[in-house]
Amino acid sequence: IIVLAADNLMDFSLSNFYTYYRKVNGSCVCVKEVKPHELAKMGIVLMDENDRIYDFEEKPKNPKSHIGAFAVYIYKRETAKLLKDYLKEGNNPDAPGNFPAWLCRREPVYGYVFQGQCYDIGTPDAYGEVQELYRVEQE
């Protein structure tokens, strides 16, 4: 099951992401090293030498790493059944990053370090900034 946030603009290969998912045979999150000023605005992960996420904190005040998680996920079909448990525990149904944070404490979740860009364009200001970036690149 592929989940993509509708307010993201990305230029990396979903095919490569899917190939990685098949290789690790586990749920996956797109991750990448991010700039310090972006850390408080996104989920931050810690991964082991096999890219398995062992800590995932959504929008931390004191980030433990510079690896940010983006709202691009692939879940195993069996994992989708755990959404019921997640919601029964009273977790936020409107914060998609909280589910993989919860999930990585229950089963293997892997970080796919992607090449390319992924922008959150969920606010008018963010959308305008990305429009300007693309305008400059085309000149």
Give each language-model segment a name:
Residues 1-48, 84:
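Conserved beta-loop-beta/alpha segment of the NTase-like Rossmann-fold superfamily
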